[in-house]
Amino acid sequence: MKKTFAAVALVLATAGVAAQNYEPSPDLEALHVPLDGLLELHVRDGLVYYRALQGDRGRLNQYIAALNAPAVVSAYPKWSDNQKKAFWLNAYNALVLQTVVRHYPIQGGAKAYPSNSVRQIPGAFEKTPHGIAGKQLTLDQIENTVLAEFNDPRVYIALGRGAVGSGRLRSEAFSGKAVDKQLDQVKAQFAVTPRWVKIEPLSGRVSISPILSWRAQAFIGEYADDSFDLPKREPIERAVIGFLRPHLLAAEEEFIKKNTFQLAYEPFDWRLNDLTGGRPD
């Protein structure tokens, strides 16, 4: 994929093709090669070198423009569900990167969020429309409407919301051929990383990211029946345990089965997931 990306970049640079005139291949795997290269170069451990990406924004903008090209719009209905799922995950994550880069460095005054938060950008998620696959959609519409149709709650922890509290942004694009495996990896990593999940037998607590509560019905529908037998627990509590169950250590499983734990949602960390100048504390 690295060689392919380099070849594509060389051809485009040599031809001097403007982003709006670039007609991409309608094949999904080839379409996402540029994003794959950008993520590999600028993302580490879910954090982004935004200053460096800002200098590379031409390629990012060109990739996003390609997602709404006529060839893509006409080919989209022929893609499989997995190809469409990968497409929208990549589109969302790329659009968040573009949004941050356009306003970087972020310095906002809204007291409800950190000064460098993507939430300091007015309307970033709920108001700004983006042309993707022939539609005009906000980021919230992509998440709440388009991605919701796949009935796969793993997608919500695969979204890079431009925040430290988001699921870990991968250093590769999602692929239609591999998206199910990639999402399994996202889930497994999420379930064992203290940033998102803490199982503490000594304090009797299971602390988890609020992302699962934001999308409670989706997680309940997929994971509640996978829980241990936990009488008198709410559906979302059973769903959380069903979600975590395949990834529990023996001691953690023993603690959960006692059914004495308290489930708590940690505050979402809206600090920018920026690696420029060092990791966030």
Language-model segment annotations:
Residues 21-281:
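Interaction/scaffold regions that mediate signaling and macromolecular assembly across diverse proteins
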Residues 1-4:
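Positively charged n-region of N-terminal signal peptides that target proteins for export
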Residues 13-18:
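N-terminal signal peptide c-region/cleavage motif recognized by signal peptidases
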